[in-house]
Every structure is written in C-alpha cells, then in structure tokens.
Amino acid sequence: MTEGVIWKEILFFAIPLILGNLFQQLYNTVDSIIVGNYVGSNALAAVGSSGAIINLLIGFCIGASTGAGVVISQFYGAKNTEGVRKAVHTTMAIALVAGVLLTVIGITVTPSMLRLMGTPDKVFEQSVIYLQVYFGGSLFSVVYNMSAGVLNAVGNSRRSLVYLMIAAISNIFLDLIMVVGLKLGIVGAALATDISQLISCIFIWGFLIRSEDVYKLKIKEIRCYDHLLSKIIRIGIPTGIQNIVISLSNLIVQTSVNSFGATVMAGFAAYIKIDGFNILPVLSISMAATTFAGQNIGARKPDRVRKGMYISTVMGAGYSVLTGIMLLIFAPQVIGVFTTNQKVVEYGVYIMRYFCPFYWMLGILHVLGGTIRGTGKTMQAMVVFLVSLCGFRVMWIAGTMAWTRSLGHVMMCYPPSWLLGMLLMLLYVWKGKWMDL
C-alpha cells in the first residue's frame, strides 16, 4: 500500500474487509432472525441484551489485535521481515492466552452482569444460557480475528474474506438445523455461532501455516518476544480500554432500555443488528485507513498518509449517508424481518429513525480515528472516543433517567456523542502532532 493510486489502494483493500464484516454481521443477524421467528420475541430480547456483554469482554482483545496490526503493518512497510515474523508469532501467543481467559471470564461473570443490567426475569434464564454457550467458543473467535488482523496488516484482506464467507454460510445452515430442525432453541443458535467460528479459525490457521510469505506461522515458534509484546501492549491497550469503556457506556444504555420491558428490548435488539450493516463497513474503512497509515509511516511517506486520510474519510462518510437514507426509507420492512410482533416492529422503527440521519458523523469520527491509530497515536484517539462516546453518554443517561423515563430521551444520547467525537477528532487532526514520525 506504499505505492500506486491512493484511492484504489484503500478501496480495493477495504472492499474485502467490508464484505467480510457484512458476512460476519449476516451470521449474527441470522441468529436473531431465526430466534425471533422460531423461538419468540423474548428469546430475541435475550440475544439482543447479550450483545452489550459480548462487546464489553471482547473489546480488550480487539485492542490487542489493533496493537499487533499497527506493529506488523509498520514492519511490513519498512520491509523488516524479521520484525514481521516475530510480531506474527507474538500475536498468536496473545490470541491463545486471551481466548482462554475470555472463555473462563465470560462463562463466570455472565449471570452477575445480566443481573447488574436489570435483565427482566422472563428473559434472564435464556440470556444466561445463550451467553455461556457463546463464550464457550470465544477462543475460536479471538484466534480467527487476530489471525485475520495479521493478513490485513500486510494487505491481504481477500483471504480472510473467503474464510469468513465459509463461516457465514455454515452458520446459516447450522442455525436452520439446530434451531428449526432439532428444536434446540437459543442453545442451538449459540452453538451454530461457535461451530462456524471454529471452521473459520481452522481455515485461516491452515493458510498461515502453509504460507511461504514473511507472515508464515510456525507452531513451534509461537511465543512472546518481550520487546514486541511491550510495543503491542503500548499501542493496543489504549484501544482496548477505549473499547471496554465505550462498551460499558452501551451497557448502561442497554440497562436503561431493559427498564422499559421485553418488547422494547426486542425492538432495540432488532435495530442493533441492522445498525451493524452501517457501522461495520465504516469500521472496515477505518481498518483500511489504519493499515494504510501504518505501512506508509513505516515507509516514511507522511504526505501519502495525509492524502489517504482525506480519501478514506470521504469514503466512510459517503457510505454512512447512503445507508442512513436507505434505512430511513425502508425501516418498517427491515425491522419486520426479525419478528411478526407489530409492537416490536414499531419500537424498532422508532429507534432507527432517531439515528439514521446522523450516521455520517459516525463515519467521519471512526475513519479519522483509524488513521490516527495507524500512526501509533492510539492514546490520543482513545481520549477522544472516551470523552465523547462514553463520558457524554453516561452523563446524558444519568440526567435523562433522573428527569424523565422516556425511551426517546435515552436514544438521543447517541447522535450528540457522535457530533462531539467528530468535532474533537477534527480539532486534533487540525492542531495535533499526529504526523510526527
């Protein structure tokens, strides 16, 4: 990515990432569609409320993946093959340890977290079951995502897309077999996700082991190289903390939503699944910007980094505008895919129409943040995200719930936080020393 036409390099790298994330969102959404239609709206609410906890616990692992990706992309851009080799094997060691820890912690804390969230009794048991089965397979998810991060860091986003497509198709068939055919209910949905993640994990590790490129994986060489571990942690921890704290703020929002009952929870769950089809492509463009910036920082090409930031920001904002318009127009039809319960559909549409007009701000915020992380300035990006997407939301919810119990007021914590984050990020780009090499 250090040579060639910038917009083509970013776009052609981002497209497989976008398709991959859409496929990943697809098999998460299929869980909800099948559960909502074949198990019931309470089960849909259980799956939806589980999402906040899943995001909370995997956030730190995503941070580690970001740190590894920045380190690998900078080594790759500088043509430091030994650095790439050591960073890849350190990344895999982190993935294995993090995956095991996530499994144990996730299964253990699930009941307590759901109680803290005020999950209604009629969906509590199903939420516990779904989450604990899901976390049973979290090792596969962590290993796959960090392995895909290695491929993305060296510019090979197409290969991970193929394996994710296989996993998505497998998940759909497994959902139909386990939920519809075997009548395993919410357990079947979680098992289908676990097995599909295992399939993608096997495929991507097989490719890395067979590869003859600089990122070839050798099982016997998996270990933590101290100097690289500290560098990955130094870059990754701010992103991990950012993800965890933002997930905590979303957990607080989910807790507020739970207080309105299972029907509202189901409507919110349906919206969140659809929202993924906007945010995940934006995050894919952000990841492309991170890799582009990392490789060109390694190659000592700051002007190319700056131009790449402008181009990728236009891409992210443009995509968000298009999806926002489409979802505003087709909101009832889209939410109606998840359930036949008309009240749930009404709440889902109500929530969706609060957010869609403001998606473009989220696009700008995330893509600028991705570029800044690629230069290694993850601490600065973390501060912007924490102030806006966490601090502001928590204060808004605290004030809103003390003043009035209105679903609309709760939902309105999101757009102003996106505006604040976008403005702070633009200010940092304009005045900050983010391009210092």
Predicted regions and their residues:
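Short alpha-helical transmembrane segments in multi-pass integral membrane proteins
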Residues: 1-14, 72-137, 181-237, 293-358, ...
